Amino acid sequence: MRKLWGLYLGLLDNHPLVTKSLSTGFLMGTGDILAQRLEHKFKDEKSQFKLDYKRVATMSTVGIFYSGPMLHYWYRSLDIMVKGEGRSVIIKKMLIDQLLFAPVAIGGFMTVTNFINNKGELKNLENFTKELFYAVKINWLIWPAAQIINFSLVPPNLRVLYSSIISIFWGMFLSHISFDKDHHIRNQNKEIN
């Protein structure tokens, strides 16, 4: 395990963007597999579980080409924007991250997955907006504390990995609201009632 960790750190030093992007893609795909297993368990335990490989590939691809690179550049930019150490710097970084970056990143993620799911068409803007606000509210229950830990304890070169590990669980939630047909039907029924 120590050799594997050393290899990862070496790749991180020599190829930071590629390493972070691939790690994020792997962990987002893992989160989606877990989300699918949980969705199956809560819906219909009698039928045999069948993994949706396209959905896993979509989440992994979004991690590699969207989330990983975005986080790499975001954390670098945040360190340039807010310099120094101490509690006030950590709080400033967390607030900027959560009030500016998080809504844009979540909206971007949902736009990309919506675009992929609907074969190039963006559908139902009103439902998209409701789901975005819902996701941002849930985000604020999890990520402020996670980011305080990230900005205070995690070395800058490992922040994307840390966020990606936390994102296994966060990705399960985003995957669920992006792909689960029953979730979309429940939201549409709430509109009608």
Curated annotation (Swiss-Prot):
Q: Does the keyword Membrane apply?
A: yes
The organism's place on the tree of life at top rank: Eukaryota
**Per its UniProt record, what Pfam families does this chain match?**
Mpv17_PMP22
Q: Kindly list the GO CC terms recorded for this protein.
A: cytoplasm; membrane; mitochondrion
Q: Which residues cross the membrane?
A: 56-78, 96-116, 132-152, 160-180
Keywords for this protein: Membrane, Transmembrane, Transmembrane helix
Give the way it sits in the membrane. Answer: Multi-pass membrane protein
Per the database entry, which stretches of residues form a coiled coil?
none
Q: Where in the cell is it found?
A: Membrane
What PANTHER family does the entry give?
PEROXISOMAL MEMBRANE PROTEIN 2, PXMP2 MPV17, PROTEIN MPV17
Protein family per UniProt: Belongs to the peroxisomal membrane protein PXMP2/4 family.
Q: What is this protein called?
A: PXMP2/4 family protein 2
